[in-house]
């Protein structure tokens, strides 16, 4: 699981387009 997390962080940073799409989704889930 740790490996996936480490790979996911840099992946999102490299793909700001996808990160923006996931940002609103995560914010909604937290709210």
UniProtKB/Swiss-Prot annotation:
Keyword Cell membrane belongs to the record: no
The keyword Iron is annotated on this UniProt entry: no
Post-translational modifications reported in the UniProt record: Processed by the macrocyclase-peptidase enzyme POPB to yield a toxic cyclic hexapeptide. POPB first removes 10 residues from the N-terminus. Conformational trapping of the remaining peptide forces the enzyme to release this intermediate rather than proceed to macrocyclization. The enzyme rebinds the remaining peptide in a different conformation and catalyzes macrocyclization of the N-terminal 6 residues.
Entry keywords, A to Z: Toxin
Sites of the Cyclopeptide (Trp-Pro) crosslink: 11-16
Record family assignment: Belongs to the MSDIN fungal toxin family.
Name of this chain's protein: MSDIN-like toxin proprotein 4
Species: Amanita phalloides
